[in-house]
A protein has these predicted regions:
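A short coil-to-beta-strand element that immediately follows conserved catalytic motifs
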Residues: 61-72
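Conserved Nudix-box catalytic region and its N-terminal flanking loop in Nudix hydrolases
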Residues: 19-57
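Short connector loops at helix/strand junctions that flank enzyme active sites
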Residues: 11, 19, 63, 76-79
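Charged phosphate-binding loop/patch that engages nucleotide di/tri-phosphates or the phosphate backbone
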Residues: 117-150
Length: 150
């Protein structure tokens, strides 16, 4: 928390939505919920660099063109959300702490055990209505042009 505020600062995270048509790639650790690839942005990194690093570490996917689409503010994390259209020949493989890597139809995500931000980000990208969090709140969305990512 900052000394002037009782509100905790949001941790910044690079989140990547990998798409193949109507399918989205989700990853999971052992005995964990499914999630979008991504992770914490290091203090010396730009969000794009963190997104590339996390995607490579978690899925082995490299040299994909990532497009920054929006920021998504959850209760504890600020997600810098990127999209990558993955060629059919690319085969993601679990790496680092990830034990499962799997493609799902975007419509299947709401029936999977996922975090609220994962579900909301996928729904936003596929033009579906934004679902509310369990406490009734929804995430905050900011377009890249509203806030610099440096």
């Amino acid at each position: 928390m900052s000394p002037r505020s009782s509100t905790p600062e949001l941790k910044e995270r690079a989140t990547v939505v990998c798409r193949q048509g109507q399918r989205v790639l989700l990853v999971a650790r052992t005995a964990s919920r499914w999630a979008l690839p991504g992770g914490t942005i290091k203090s010396d990194e730009l969000p794009l660099d963190a997104a590339c690093r996390e995607l490579r570490e978690e899925t082995g996917l490299i040299a994909l063109e990532l497009t920054y689409v929006f920021q998504f503010g959850g209760l504890t994390k600020l997600h810098h959300v990127f999209v990558a259209d993955v060629p059919v020949h690319a085969k993601p493989q679990p790496g680092m702490e990830i034990t499962r890597c799997r493609w799902f139809g975007h419509f299947e995500v709401n029936s999977l055990p996922t975090s609220v931000p994962t579900l909301q980000i996928v729904e936003l990208l596929y033009n579906r209505s934004l679902v509310s969090a369990e406490d009734g709140s929804a995430g905050q969305i900011t377009s890249p042009s509203d806030t610099p990512i440096e």
